[in-house]
Amino acid sequence: MEFYCKSGERIHVDILGEGFPIVFLHGNNLQSSYFAKQRVLEKSFKLLFVDSLGHGKSGELQGETSFAYLADSLEELLSSLSIEKCLLVGHSDGANLALEYAGRHGERVAGILANSGNITFSGLKFLPRYACYLEEWLYRFLGLFLPAFKRKSRVSPLLRENVDVPKEIFRKAPYPVVVLVGDRDMIKRKHSMAIAKLFPKGKFLERKGQGHNIPKKDSAYFNHLIEKMAQDIQLETPVSIVRRKN
């Protein structure tokens, strides 16, 4: 379905299944199809696969290039769908977006699975940090000639952006947070552990033999983790089912 923000910007979201809502947030210059192997979960849950502004089938990002702006646009979408509580599942920059959203609109968050995210640019290992600068420069250059790369260059600065949320907000969060990385990830291990420690109900998990793409490379484990989190959340707190406003 297509949703139009107050700004006129268009967000594309695929909604599958029924039940407890799980919102999937993809990484930088990717799209919701990244989570293709998670669609099997529609048998048990309501799944929302969101293309962030400037990505995938969504319209162009017209406002500022920031996680805060994307988080507020996501809030407009979820509010329009009358979602009271949901589990946020974010990969890479999508994990950063999930954390930014939780800091700004925590009342709608029932839990977070943050896979391979980094709340500061310094949380990346050296070579991936260097690659971010190279990628951004390459997109800008190619964008002078090719529209597809011009679009990529619009959102690539997010690769270097920090999550702008006071840590005190996270320390008061009542919901469970799982920070998942691979032992071959581009995110520093100590950085991921520090993110988990920000939350009273934070938990750090490291998957052996995996890198930055656990949802694709180890989907059985990833899906089981999502199921477990969603089931535990439902046992602890009654949550409403997604409803569409007429």
What are these regions (language model features)?
Residues N96-R104, A110-L138:
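Flexible "cap/lid" loop of the alpha/beta hydrolase fold
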Residues Q210-N223:
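Catalytic histidine-centered segment of alpha/beta-hydrolase-like enzymes
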Residues A173, V179-V181:
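Short beta-strand/loop motif that positions the catalytic acidic residue
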Residues S153-I169, R184-I187:
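Active-site nucleophile elbow and catalytic-triad environment of alpha/beta-hydrolase enzymes
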Residues R39, V181-Q210:
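Conserved loop-alpha-helix segment in the C-terminal half of the alpha/beta-hydrolase fold
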Residues L48-L87:
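Active-site loop/oxyanion-hole signature of alpha/beta-hydrolase fold enzymes
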Residues C86, G90-A95:
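Conserved alpha/beta-hydrolase "nucleophile elbow" surrounding the catalytic nucleophile
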